[in-house]
Design a protein with these regions (language model features):
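C-terminal-biased regions
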Residues: 2-42, 49, 53-146
Length: 146
């Protein structure tokens, strides 16, 4: 069994479980946002404005929760960077080589998963924005003809 509380550098003392828990929470919140964005897209395509307004509120709330977790992670990573003698603006990926070898694959995997999910979320947000824009154009065209 791997002891995650071990440290890899004399000046760095923190719980690997805390960082892992924070990353798992962030991953879960991003997953929740992805689900909301899919629902938002369905409401756009099905022309359900009342449902869309409600989902938009949920999306904003979820994005705030994600932002809060991301800020916590950035603070944690800044502290780690300082402890390892690295620049404060180092990314978690840049700090992974400082971690104990036994923990590196686990953290690499979850960081990759989070980054992939963020990319998917950005694509979905862009799709939804374009759909809403196109829906507005079509509505304007219909009203101009009427």
């Amino acid at each position: 069994m791997v002891n995650l509380t071990q440290t890899s550098s004399p000046g760095v003392d923190f719980s690997w479980e805390d960082l892992l828990s924070l990353l798992r929470d962030e991953l879960g919140e991003y997953g929740g946002l992805m689900g909301l964005l899919s629902s938002q897209q369905a409401s756009i395509l099905n022309r359900e404005p009342e449902n869309l307004l409600e989902i938009n509120k949920s999306v904003r709330s979820q994005m705030e929760a994600n932002n809060n977790l991301q800020q916590r992670r950035h603070g944690y990573v800044r502290s780690l960077a300082t402890g390892y003698g690295k620049p404060e603006d180092s990314s978690l990926s840049e700090l992974l080589p400082c971690f104990p070898v036994v923990t590196q694959p686990m953290f690499e995997s979850i960081v990759e998963e989070i980054n992939n999910l963020i990319s998917r979320i950005r694509r979905k947000l862009d799709q939804n924005r374009r759909l809403i824009s196109r829906l507005g154009e079509v509505t304007d065209q219909i009203l101009a003809v009427a």
